[in-house]
């Protein structure tokens, strides 16, 4: 049906274009038909030796006075003339000249008679009545009708949203009276606390008496906050499916368009429709696009966005109450939202959707592995242990990549090899071609083993999981460490261990090859340790300056809604002391890394030879070889090093 409608519209537009072209052509020929036909014929019928040209009316009068004009033919109600002349200037050769006669030159015929010039006036052709009607009446009507039709049906005017300009103020929210998203609470794992909050909302909608009997009121709004990929939108899909009430869904960016006032009008229209369908749920995804703090950032506020936000605040909890409308918002930038939007009465609850813990990852992997044939050697528990810091979206992508790899290798089930390769692709990037056995490859091997050795002998660092010389992404070599589950609290020794391990690659280069052979491969390592050491001094109070927070985490974020006055506020001498303390920390850690490399010089050579032979070495094999030469402590905290 849509195809037929599109064909009809296309045919109509083609017809309008053709009719307009025909009428314009007809009108053009009608206006200059005489000079384009009769006078043109006269010119074309002149002897080839005759000079043909155009002449101004003033020059024509000069020819007349000089007696050089022989004959004149008048056309188009004396608006055009074909003049036969001969001029001594051109050797008295015959000339056929076209002259445009200005309006009001009524004395021309008198002058021709006065100079005894042979002339003839040719009557204008009768205009076709159909052409007259078509050009003067029908064409403007067709043009206006076509313009109105296009204006009302064009998707381009509606900001690409499929709306006509006549309905720009209408809400673009998708409405489903009985939504079937295909997602239920059974399909959600790893975020049990958030799921419990939403199950309570569903229970309130289905059994309100159970809550109202004790004086409870249903929350007006729930704000989902968390990193990308943790399942905020998935929760919204689940509540839409489970609540069995009308559901509106819209993105925050869909409110504001190029026209002033559209955003506020769409908010009003959305809540009007929601009130008519109450009880219902309104889901606003990426609400930070419209709910950003007012008047903040460079250049102050944006009037259109702030007007939209003001309307949203009024609709959620203003003078007029929208009973039975539950607003669910989702964002990963709650820190930049306007305070008025976050207060109780608008968003009564803020549900934090964190990255899943180990048990949560196991549950998520089980959900996404339902329709995938896994080999007997695949352990979801081991995979969950290996992937701390992965979001639900990351885990879903990991199993999907493993399934794609199994298909590529023409296997009927997903084995451990595909799962491991998929994890490596997500963490490090797509594998490149193996490097040739050159000096650079040996240097990279020592660099990566330097990271692994320093990280392994430090008690506050974590276990090595894998060392590889296979290029991935922009890295020539990689050393993976298995992170601990809880990274929210890091001790000073743990931070120093990170810096020492990061500098271990450069330390190995200097010890093995000498200071003149130290390469640029540790450039990203130096950036990491400088940033970490600076945070130890300015944010964590882990230096001789004392327990002072000299810099805020959001410093420099003015374009994201931060305050212009939130920069660093300390004297120049304090800035010099900060630089000195950062330098002291990095120098100490680098000396410690060199010391560790020197103490383990023999085993480093053995491990490098094994690594060059195998390209990849797992953590167990590495520790087994290392433990024969040194005593390894118990492990604690995370890090991944890259050689660029």
Swiss-Prot record:
PROSITE patterns listed in its UniProt record: AAA
GO MF annotations, alphabetized: ATP binding; ATP hydrolysis activity; ATP-dependent peptidase activity; metalloendopeptidase activity; zinc ion binding
Main location, first listed in the record: plastid
Stromal compartment residues: 1-11, 150-644
Binding site for Zn(2+): 447, 451, 525
Record SUPFAM superfamilies: FtsH protease domain-like, P-loop containing nucleoside triphosphate hydrolases
Cofactor(s) for this UniProt protein: Zn(2+)
Protein name according to UniProt: ATP-dependent zinc metalloprotease FtsH
Subcellular location: Plastid, Chloroplast thylakoid membrane
Subunit and interaction comment: Homohexamer.
SMART domains for this protein: AAA (SM00382)
Signal peptide: none
Enzyme class: hydrolase
NCBIfam families listed in its UniProt record: FtsH_fam (TIGR01241)
Binding site for ATP: 226-233
Transmembrane intervals: 12-32, 129-149
GO biological process: protein catabolic process; proteolysis
Keywords: ATP-binding, Chloroplast, Hydrolase, Membrane, Metal-binding, Metalloprotease, Nucleotide-binding, Plastid, Protease, Thylakoid, Transmembrane, Transmembrane helix, Zinc
Active-site positions on this chain: 448
Function comment: Acts as a processive, ATP-dependent zinc metallopeptidase.
One cellular-component annotation, GO: chloroplast thylakoid membrane
Membrane topology type: Multi-pass membrane protein
